[in-house]
Amino acid sequence: YNFLNDAGEVDGFEREVGDELCARAELTCEWVTNEWDSIIPNLTSGNYDTIIAGMSITDEREEVIDFSQNYFPPAASAYAAKSADADLKGGIVAAQTSTIQAGYVAESGATLLEFATYDETVAAVNNGEADAVFADKDALVPTVEESGGEMVFVGDDVPLGGGIGLGLRESDTELKAKFDTAIQSMKDDGSLNKLIIKWFGEGAKTF
């Protein structure tokens, strides 16, 4: 969804979407980066005004912050492992801390092994700490493809969450309305779908 390019700037799908939303909402926006595990507390405390970071809209997060309408459809999550017969129900499954996937694993009966970053969850499978990783399928596809057959998808895809939206403070109703209008206009004119396909390929889910 986003990454730092060689120049140290925020780049990727969300950079393009964010810049376009700010232009349509007539807002002057400055990009900052933050660690995932403190991203919501630092929003509520006022360090920045919105989160655009691949954050799924969930009931749990809605208790603390507000979300815009989604700018990315509910994505499939998936399991990947070193073998097709990995134990997903009774084994050890790695997931990123404080994600919708971690919550799902915790309730699935498997033993949840949490890591701060996606890369660490994959490493846990590769080094034998975990039997499988459970993550956004969009993130896992290139990982599995580039593993040279070392990693495979296991079981069925699992649709989770209400899609990805902008995280906002509950008090910022005016800002939320501006972003909602801008997102809707990008959905209506097809520009959002174009960006989804540009960054995630022809097979990606669109609006």
Question: Which residues make up each language-model segment?
Answer:
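Periplasmic-binding protein-like
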Residues: 72-77, 137, 141, 145-184, ...
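Alpha-to-beta junction loops
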Residues: 26-28, 44-53, 127-135, 139, ...
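Ligand-binding cleft/hinge of the Venus flytrap
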Residues: 1-7, 18-27, 96-118, 122, ...
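Extracytoplasmic small-molecule ligand-binding "clamshell" domains
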Residues: 1-54
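Extended ligand-binding regions for polar small-molecule ligands
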Residues: 15-24, 96-100, 163-203
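Ligand-binding clefts/hinges and TM-proximal coupling segments of bilobed small-molecule sensing domains
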Residues: 103-120, 153-154, 183-207
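Flexible hinge/capping segments at coil-to-helix
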Residues: 76-94
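Short helix-initiation/N-cap motifs at beta->coil->alpha
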Residues: 15-16, 30-42, 97-99, 113-127, ...
